[in-house]
């Protein structure tokens, strides 16, 4: 009976280790996540002025969530899609957002950017 318990524990530990590895090396960032990070930026993207602290915090969160090239390319495509879908987003305001927040996320904010060129 003890061997079964020990074997079961080893198998459980193996499964947990595999799942943690999958979570750590998970897929690239997803558009709903990108949209959530930058939802507070919509007023700025439409009207200009100064982005809110919550907008800049979201931009910082996006930077942290997109450390790899693949993540940045996905985030870029998400941003491009939103910019071309939501009416009233000003491309010039979008391009200025990273500088206004003091955050370089490595993803240009533009409706026309080639996201495949991002490193």
Swiss-Prot record:
KW Signal (keyword) present: yes
Database matches in Pfam families: Tryp_alpha_amyl (PF00234)
Gene Ontology biological-process annotations: lipid transport
GO molecular function annotations of the record: lipid binding
Top-level taxon: Eukaryota
Disulfide bond positions: 31-78, 41-55, 56-101, 76-115
Keyword Disulfide bond annotated: yes
Secretion signal span: 1-28
Keywords per UniProt: Disulfide bond, Lipid-binding, Signal, Transport
Family membership: Belongs to the plant LTP family.
Function: Plant non-specific lipid-transfer proteins transfer phospholipids as well as galactolipids across membranes. May play a role in wax or cutin deposition in the cell walls of expanding epidermal cells and certain secretory tissues.
Designated name of the protein: Non-specific lipid-transfer protein 11
Organism: Arabidopsis thaliana
